[in-house]
Amino acid sequence: MKIAVIGAGIYGCHIALKLSEAGFNVDLIERESDIMKITTDISLRAHSGYFYGRSPETMIACNKNSKLFLKEYPNSLFDHDKHYYIIAKNGSKITGKEYLATLDKYKLPYKKTKVPLINPDFVDVAIEVEELSYDPNLLREEVRIKLKKSKVNLILNTDVSDLPFREYDLRIISGYASNNDISRAITGKTIQ
């Protein structure tokens, strides 16, 4: 089976590597000049689930996957000083009480705190958590090494509209903000 993975961010690279390890013929296609250039530098957190207080399924998945991420890419992770999550008194779609109840239910550890430089009059609840960060340059290099050792065919500087997609048995879109543009180029339709 020949597979195209479109988008060489961390997810696209990881998917391509795992499919290649499973014995599939994989082309990893990226329009930029290098892997992980667009979104990798934005978050810098190996999300452990705290961000998703209104979605227990996502919270659980993130918590599980952050542990897998640590095993898979240990050289790019480091323990950062402090990570805070804050629920505002007004305008939030979840209350502090609901948020803490969800964290307790799914056993995500936290410590209630006051956050420096944040006016406590606007805060329903603030917590400090232990959550790893990643260095985007170290992560990029770690992934680059894995790709070079693999059988993944990395195709850079290539727009999806330039590719003969009928040659692929499966096409996986991993383009983040570009998902609809990629889908439209391949199928003529946007992702719903």
Question: Where on the chain are the PLM-derived regions?
Answer:
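N-terminal Rossmann-like FAD-binding beta1-loop-alpha1 element of flavoenzymes
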Residues: 2-27
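Dinucleotide-binding Rossmann-like beta1-alpha1 core, especially the glycine-rich loop
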Residues: 43-125
